[in-house]
UniProtKB/Swiss-Prot annotation:
Encoding gene (name): lipB
Alphabetical list of PANTHER family matching this protein: LIPOYLTRANSFERASE 2, MITOCHONDRIAL-RELATED, OCTANOYLTRANSFERASE
Function: Catalyzes the transfer of endogenously produced octanoic acid from octanoyl-acyl-carrier-protein onto the lipoyl domains of lipoate-dependent enzymes. Lipoyl-ACP can also act as a substrate although octanoyl-ACP is likely to be the physiological substrate.
Keyword field: Acyltransferase, Cytoplasm, Transferase
GO BP: any one term: protein modification process
PROSITE patterns to which the protein is assigned, alphabetical: BPL_LPL_CATALYTIC, LIPB
Stated name of the protein: Octanoyltransferase
Species in which this protein is naturally found: Streptomyces coelicolor (strain ATCC BAA-471 / A3(2) / M145)
Pfam family, one: LplA-B_cat
Family of the protein in this entry: Belongs to the LipB family.
Any GO molecular function: lipoyl(octanoyl) transferase activity
Amino acid sequence: MSELRFVRMGFGADRVEYQEAWDEQRRVHAARFVDEVPDTVLLLEHPPVYTAGRRTEDSERPLDGTPVIDVDRGGKITWHGPGQLVGYPIQKLPRPVDVVAHVRRLEEALIRTCAEFGLETSRVEGRSGVWVLGDPVEQRPVLGGLSLDFDPRLSDDEFDPRLNGPEYAPSNAGQRREDRKIAAIGIRVAKGVTMHGFALNVNPDNKWFDKIIPCGIRDAGVASLANELGRDVTIEEVLPVAERHLRDVLENAELKPRVIEKTPA
């Protein structure tokens, strides 16, 4: 794969308004499609903003009328703001694009980033993003001598069966306390080129998540590097580490088109 270009758009006092970043994404996307620029990762921090993906339900929006920007990515509603490292990888991939493989690569880079700071994270079966797993529950609920197996896959609209395999922790069917998402991922692919990307919680004020159901997932919490490690962690610390792991994972990936299974005649 060709070398990645990283663009640091703005952090801290120079945070980038969401609309400005979205416009820049579309500009770079168009340039990448015609090979005017190489694969590019925009890295930045936003002022506080809620964005809603295409599948967001009205019931998942803030109840107090807080403004929300509707965007053309997958997924549901989320928050971006101070203390969150946001990355928008704009890459040309072989068609038909294997979106799941792209998501897995972003997850891998973020898992490695968290590990470098001493935090173990994981994927969770059926759910995108990077997670801090809840502590094991010693005993599952028992009713009338029968062990109850609450399997969220039976009723969870957000469960994606494509997100599975040995690199995923089993979906939480009550065997763990609440899992906590530390990095959200939402992707759009147009003309074989990716847009949108990830948001890694470094040291945000988590009260912003209280107004919404983050990513439409009701049975999970929100994590950050600072809270999980019990110390202050800054974006300035995390930025070069995340860049390095993104470069390593994305530049060294063996890119393949999505395999389309043929239906028997």
